[in-house]
Regions:
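NAD(P)+-binding Rossmann beta1-loop-alpha1 motif at the extreme N-terminus of oxidoreductases
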Residues: 1-52
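Active-site-proximal catalytic alpha-helix in oxidoreductases
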Residues: 184-212, 216-229, 256
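Rossmann-like NAD(P)(H) cofactor-binding subdomain of soluble oxidoreductases
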Residues: 29, 53-138
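NAD(P)-dependent Rossmann-like dehydrogenase/reductase catalytic/cofactor-binding core
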Residues: 218-316
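Nucleotide donor/acceptor-binding cores
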Residues: 1, 71, 146
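Helix-loop-beta segment of a Rossmann-like dinucleotide-binding subdomain
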Residues: 93, 137-152, 202-211, 259-268
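Rossmann-fold dinucleotide-binding core
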Residues: 104-186, 190
Length: 316
């Protein structure tokens, strides 16, 4: 199976490593030239809790324009970049190519549907901590149990066959992936969790464990989660609150010492965040369904104001 990984940073490289170990032929597409050049010259160093190995045989490119038609294209760019990246990726997408989003947030499948038919779109999310330790070096910190869930936007023979093939390839490479008939509960669970610790930590400029340890921070996270669960239930996805309650100690244990990605974007690097597909998406769905989401709405507005005014902020 010929697969293009569009966006081969930390998560994209880790996912590609598992797929390469599972037997896929991989094209890594990323504008990070030093990373692509290092992989092309020396292979990809892949570190996991079990040890380190060097994986070879990758094709690398800064663009999808000249890599030929793929069997599958996996998007691993920031959700805010999906439309622009898809426009650039179309040269390698043929009439039978299956397009997969394993990105953060809600609505990526809707953006993909602007470019290809929904019967060949898969979407989902991973539960794997990842790191790019340097050019050509990626690190996987997998969760226990199933590490990745994905499914079809519309179940049909083509999408189901592609999903099962992707599941088998991930599993053969050591990633415990699951192709699910209805992937929405897993996507919403991750989005709700992210909207809590990511959004609140970004506003507070705190690590995850510090946000949860402070009674006010913890209270805000719980409000964000409860609103997200109410929206999910209104969509017919089910009651996710019991799952979120069980998830809290795992989040603190596994992510507690880190500034989450939104805090890194907003505080450390002054980059555009994914607020619009996390808290912002929950708020939009809530408005559409008549479900109040005051905490998610306020956090969305605060982060949006911050990222709209990086050049004007007082730095001391």
């Amino acid at each position: 199976m010929k697969i293009a990984m569009i966006g081969s940073g930390a998560a994209g490289s880790v996912f590609a490593a598992y797929l390469r170990k599972g037997g896929a032929e991989l094209w890594l597409v990323d504008k990070y030239k030093a990373h692509m050049d290092k992989i092309a010259a020396d292979g990809l160093v892949f570190r996991t809790p079990e040890g380190e190995e060097v994986l070879t045989g990758f094709h690398t490119s800064a663009t999808a324009h000249d890599i030929g038609t793929m069997d599958m294209v996996i998007l691993m760019v920031k959700a805010t970049q999906t439309a622009d990246v898809m426009a650039d990726t179309m040269p390698c997408i043929g009439p039978e190519t299956v397009v997969v989003s394993l990105q953060n947030g809600l609505g990526n499948d809707e953006v993909l549907a602007q470019f290809v038919e929904t019967d060949r779109i898969l979407y989902g999310s991973g539960l794997i901590g990842t790191e790019l330790a340097g050019p050509g070096v990626c690190v996987s910190k997998p969760e226990k149990g199933i590490q990745m869930h994905f499914g079809a936007v519309h179940n049909n023979p083509k999408a189901d066959a592609a999903g099962k093939a992707l599941e088998a390839c991930f599993q053969a490479g050591g990633c415990n992936a699951s192709f699910d008939e209805d992937v929405r509960p897993y996507i919403w669970k991750k989005v709700i969790a992210n909207s809590g610790y990511n959004g609140v930590s970004a506003v507070m400029r705190l690590k995850v464990k510090e946000t949860f340890a402070d009674p006010y921070g913890h209270d805000i996270v719980m409000h964000v989660w409860k609103e997200g669960c109410a929206v999910a239930q209104a969509l017919g996805i089910g009651d996710l609150w019991p799952l979120m309650e069980k998830e809290e100690p795992n989040i603190v244990a596994n992510l507690g010492n880190y500034y989450p990605s939104m805090a890194q974007d907003a505080v450390l690097h002054q980059r555009q965040t994914e607020i619009s597909v996390l808290n912002g998406a929950i708020a939009r769905y809530g408005e559409r369904l008549g479900v109040p989401t005051p905490s998610n709405t306020v956090i969305t507005k605060v982060i949006s104001c911050i990222q709209n005014n990086y050049d004007k902020q007082y730095l001391g």
